UniProtKB/Swiss-Prot annotation:
NCBIfam families given in the database record: folE, PRK09347.1-2, PRK09347.1-3
The encoding gene: folE
InterPro entries: GTP-CH-I_C/QueF, GTP-CH-I_N, GTP_CycHdrlase_I, GTP_CycHdrlase_I_CS, GTP_CycHdrlase_I_dom
This enzyme's EC code(s): 3.5.4.16
Annotated protein name in UniProt: GTP cyclohydrolase 1
Amino acid sequence: MSKQEQIEQTIYQLLELLGEDPNREGLLDTPKRVAKMYLEMFNGLEEDPKDQFTAVFSEGHEEVVLVKDIPFHSMCEHHLVPFYGIAHVAYIPSKGRVTGLSKLARAVEVASRRPQLQERLTHQVAHALQDALEPEGVFVMVEAEHMCMSMRGIRKPGSKTVTTVALGKYKEDAILRRELLSMIHNK
């Protein structure tokens, strides 16, 4: 039995356990759709964010590189409901070594496509960039709304969680970090 078929069977059983009739018209294809969605939403489990940094160029650029407002969505590993928001990824190249800008967004994408915690997502992106490029500094900020806080429990829609990881010069130099935060927040 394929992975998709196993997930379909599990969703079918879940619907039954919840008191639904999985054979009624509106639910007939739901197990198949949910299985397909989960396989898509969790396809980042098959990749390493660090592997996204395949293109490295010697450009002589030694100032900050920042890609901000990278949209993402992920699934909270505690409740398997979405959280979504934006990521800001910055680094200071070492010896002028830079990567393609899309690689920063790809690292966020791969790290977010799995059952995840926002804190871990932030850490994984920062350390993938650090390990791949060995830059002078790395800073990653993730801002997200969590459906586990909006739809259930405390029910506070619109509240945002912000996580950061600072490495190298961004960890050591508060002025440099403040300058970067100003760039991030300056729309």
